[in-house]
Amino acid sequence: MEVFSRSNPYRGPVKGVVLDWAGTTVDYGCIGPLSVFVEVFRHNWVEVTIEEARAPMGLSREDHLRAMCRAESVARKWEDVHGAPPSEMDIGNMARMVEAHLAYTIAQHADLIPGVVEAVEALRGQGIRIGSSTGYTSDMMDMLVPAVEENGYRPDSIVCASDVPAGRPFPWMCYQNAINLEVYPMAAMVKIGDTVADIREGLNAGMWTIGLTLTGNELGLSEEEVAAMDPEELRRRMDNIEQRFRNAGAHFVAQGLRDCPAVIRDINELLAGGERP
C-alpha cells in the first residue's frame, strides 16, 4: 500500500464510499423506524409526534432516545406524566423495547430506493469499494440485510453502531469501514447520507461528505408523497435541507444516491488539484 503524507499529498482518485442505510439506500423517506419510537413512548403514556421522533435520526438507538428526551417538548410531556425528567434507566428500558420491535419493522422496509443498484454498479465501475454504516445494531441488520440482498444490493462492508465504541457523530464506524475495505488515506473516502449526523460522522473521520436532500430523513416523505407534492413547495423544502447540510459542513449535496457517481467525479478533480476534505 502506498503511503501518503503532508509532503506527499494524496491526489486521488476516490477509492471507497461509506453509505448510510435507511433513507440513503433503502426505505425511501426513512419511514420504517418512526412508528417504533412513537409506540415506545406511548407505552410509557407519553404521546410524541412523528417530527419529534424523526429529529435525531441517524444516531444509535440509545443516543436517539436521549436526544428525544432532551427536546424541550418531549421532556415537558414526560414530566407532566411522570413528575420527573426521563432517567437513564427509563432510556435503557425504552432502548430495549425499541430493539425488540425495530428488527422486525425495518425488515418490512427493505425496498431499495430507485437508482441505488445502478449507482453502486457505477461506483464499482470506477474501482470504488462500497462500505456502509448504520445506527442499527448488528442483530437488526441480521434481519434487514438478507431482504436487501434479495433486492440486489450488498455492500462490501457493513459496520453497525454496536460494533464500535460509539456511533455517530463519532468517526469510528467510518474508520472500521476503511479497515474492512483496506482503503487509505481517509481523503480517498466519501461519506454519503441523508442526515446531519451522517455529515458530522464523515467530517470527523476526515472524509469528503455528500448530503442527500430528496430520498431521506430530512425531507421525510415517501416516494408517493414526493410525486404528489407541489413542485415549488418541494423545491423550497429541499433548499432548506441543503442549507442545513451546508451549515453542518457538507462538501456537496445531491438529491439521491443515483446522482453521486457524478459528484464523485468532481471530487476526483479536486483531489487531482491538491484539495483535501
Swiss-Prot record:
What GO terms describe the biological role, i.e. biological process, of this protein? DNA repair; organic phosphonate catabolic process
Q: What domain of life does the native source organism fall in?
A: Bacteria
Pfam families referenced in this protein's UniProt entry, alphabetically: Hydrolase
Mind listing the GO molecular function terms for this protein? phosphoglycolate phosphatase activity; phosphonoacetaldehyde hydrolase activity
Mind naming one GO cellular-component term on file for this protein? cytosol
The family database entries (PANTHER family) matched by this protein are listed as: PHOSPHOGLYCOLATE PHOSPHATASE (PTHR43434), PHOSPHONOACETALDEHYDE HYDROLASE (PTHR43434:SF19)
Q: Which HAMAP family match?
A: PhnX
Give the family per the record. Answer: Belongs to the HAD-like hydrolase superfamily. PhnX family.
Protein name per Swiss-Prot or TrEMBL: Phosphonoacetaldehyde hydrolase-like protein
Q: Source species, please?
A: Syntrophobacter fumaroxidans (strain DSM 10017 / MPOB)
